[in-house]
Design a protein with these regions (language model features):
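Helical element adjacent to the flavin cofactor pocket in flavoenzyme catalytic cores
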Residues: 2-66
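Generic structural signal for well-ordered, non-membrane alpha-helical segments
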Residues: 14, 18, 22, 71, ...
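C-terminal catalytic lobe of FAD-dependent flavoproteins
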Residues: 18, 112, 152-228
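Short, conserved active-site loop motifs that form the nucleotide-linked donor/cofactor pocket
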Residues: 33-35, 124, 188
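Hydrophobic/aromatic beta-strand patches that form the interior of the parallel beta-sheet core
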Residues: 37, 68, 189-191
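Active-site substrate-recognition segment that forms the wall
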Residues: 44, 51, 61-62, 66-186
Length: 228
């Protein structure tokens, strides 16, 4: 746009399509013998003599010697069933998918309006906002207008773009802004509270949890991320 005076390019910056990532992870887990349950929820998590068991809404009981809780903002209620306090608040973020001729081919963070634009296949994702309105997926039209207006300042062509999809997600945010990563109880680990950095911090989080589960040393600074 004409009001843009400059930009900073990070040569080592990378982006990922979360939907593709989930598909690849699902296939990898299945290939390693992992079981994936969909269309049901965890109603109860409780201890038993050999570890942990989760009672599903389908009636199935899933038993495990060791448990890793990574349920995003819903980790708080599940951790409470286990006797662990993990205080979090859902922070709603909006995502609008559009079809735009001549769309950017690299991801960009528009600092002033705090909006991110990311190519996703043939579409462009415009995402942003941080709305504290509890556990709901209501879409506020004013938030959507603010989101698109912020992007239009930098990309005027968005004004005539074809809208394809609109949705929102709940980010798990802690009071300190730090994620909660580590052993919560004997045989149980927790990894949650990453806010807007979930995908970015996922590999490092996975390594911390895996090293701790295998008895490998973890950095001293990881102590401040431990569940309390």
């Amino acid at each position: 746009g004409p009001e843009v005076r400059g930009a900073v390019i990070h040569g080592d910056g990378m982006r990922i399509d979360p939907a593709i990532l989930c598909d690849v992870m699902r296939a990898k887990i299945s290939s390693l013998g992992g079981l994936i349950r969909t269309g049901c929820v965890v109603e109860t998590i409780r201890r038993y003599s050999g570890g942990w068991e989760a009672v599903m809404s389908s009636g199935e009981i899933v038993v495990a010697g060791r448990l890793v809780l990574t349920a995003g903002v819903w980790s708080e209620s599940l951790a409470r069933m286990m006797g662990v306090s993990v205080a979090m608040q859902p922070a709603k973020g909006y995502h609008r998918m559009i079809r735009l001729a001549g769309a950017p081919t690299i991801a960009a963070v528009l600092r002033e309006p705090k909006v991110g634009v990311t190519p996703m296949g043939s579409l462009l994702r415009v995402a942003g906002t941080l709305e504290l309105s509890g556990f709901n997926h209501r879409l506020d039209p004013n938030r959507v207008k603010q989101l698109m207006a912020g992007a239009q300042t930098f990309l005027p062509g968005i004004r005539g773009a074809e809208p394809v999809d609109l949705w929102c997600g709940l980010r798990p945010c802690t009071a300190s802004g730090l994620p909660v990563i580590g052993r919560g109880l004997e045989g149980a680990w927790i990894a949650t509270g990453h806010g807007m950095m979930g995908v970015t911090l996922a590999p490092g989080t996975a390594k911390l949890i895996a090293d701790d589960m295998l008895g490998e040393p973890v950095p001293d600074w990881a102590e401040m991320l431990q569940p309390r």
